[in-house]
UniProtKB/Swiss-Prot annotation:
Essential cell division protein that stabilizes the FtsZ protofilaments by cross-linking them and that serves as a cytoplasmic membrane anchor for the Z ring. Also required for the recruitment to the septal ring of downstream cell division proteins. The lineage of its organism: Bacteria, Pseudomonadati, Pseudomonadota, Gammaproteobacteria, Pseudomonadales. Gene3D superfamilies: ZipA, C-terminal FtsZ-binding domain. The gene is zipA. This is Cell division protein ZipA. It comes from Pseudomonas paraeruginosa (strain DSM 24068 / PA7). Keywords: Cell cycle, Cell division, Cell inner membrane, Cell membrane, Membrane, Transmembrane, Transmembrane helix. Belongs to the ZipA family.
Length: 290
């Protein structure tokens, strides 16, 4: 049976229709489970940008999270006292006994004169702060050291007739954390850098009782006196232990002899007696507060 042109056209049409139906069925099946996005026609007129299209059409990327970095301009201004403390943190390799961790929560009070000038738009807030500082000023002035009831003294007397030489004495006490300060004598603060409250002090046991750093090379003394006042540091027992360690170090390294306040030999029993005096003083102070 011969197939005419008409029959061939019918067969070809059926094949085309079947192909279209099959392709549509394949597309519908392949589109299942995919999210459909409705394009906004308002973006149709935007200029093409290869960089942006790559961001939009490309695969999802995991962006690494980075902590914000700060340069020196981002950092808040600090007072001169804080700057000195930070410089003090970069101490050179000097032998030390270590700082007392007496109160981790304690922060040094900022000096109002060191504060930065406020910006002009914030005059209202700055006035409020100044008023608060003025209100606090009397309380700060009132927080003066209380009168001393007792003084614990440890004398270190040189065994050599030439006494303690200035340079060696200075090196020794600096290693123990004492720093030259008020009244031209040395003081041991909470921090080895000379910050914080005074724990104890060291004076020249020979009149006039002071030290001359300008002439320290020619200086010598037969004895020095370590002393701790009560009431004084917030933790007097720990401060006393540091004072005993500094006195023993000086006596051991510079050939000295430890004496008590009566110039008698300082024994272990005498040291325990000093500690008991501290305990008794603390007990009396608590009783008075009640």
């Amino acid at each position: 049976m011969d197939i005419g042109l008409r029959e061939w056209l019918i067969v070809i049409g059926l094949i085309v229709i079947a192909g279209i139906l099959f392709d549509g069925w394949r597309r519908m099946r392949g589109g299942k489970g995919k999210l459909k996005f409705k394009l906004d026609r308002s973006f149709a007129n935007l200029p093409d940008d290869d960089g942006d299209s790559a961001e939009l059409l490309g695969p999802a990327r995991v962006v690494e999270h980075r902590e914000p970095s700060f340069d020196e301009q981002d950092l808040p201004s600090v007072s001169a006292r804080e700057g000195k403390e930070r410089k003090g943190g970069k101490r050179q390799d000097e032998p030390r006994q270590g700082d007392l961790d007496l109160d981790e929560g304690m922060a040094l009070e900022a000096d109002p004169s060191d504060a930065a000038e406020p910006l002009e738009p914030r005059k209202g807030k700055s006035k409020g702060r100044k008023e608060k500082e003025r209100e606090k000023a009397p309380s700060v002035a009132a927080a003066e050291p209380a009168p001393v009831d007792e003084v614990l003294i440890i004398n270190v007397i040189a065994r050599d007739e030439s006494g303690f030489k200035g340079p060696a004495l200075l090196q020794n006490i600096l290693e123990s954390g004492l720093r030259f300060g008020d009244m031209d004598i040395f003081h041991r603060h909470e921090s080895m850098a000379g910050n914080g409250e005074i724990l104890f002090s060291m004076a020249n046991a020979v009149k006039p009782g002071t030290f001359d750093l300008d002439d320290i090379d020619n200086f010598s003394t037969r004895a020095v006196s370590f002393f701790l006042g009560l009431p004084g540091p917030r933790h007097p027992k720990q401060a006393f232990d540091v004072m005993v360690a500094a006195a023993r170090k000086l006596a051991h390294e510079l050939n000295g002899e430890l004496k008590d306040e009566q110039r008698s030999v300082l024994t272990a029993q005498t040291i325990e007696h000093y500690r008991q005096r501290i305990i008794d003083h603390e007990r009396r102070s608590l009783m008075q507060k009640r």
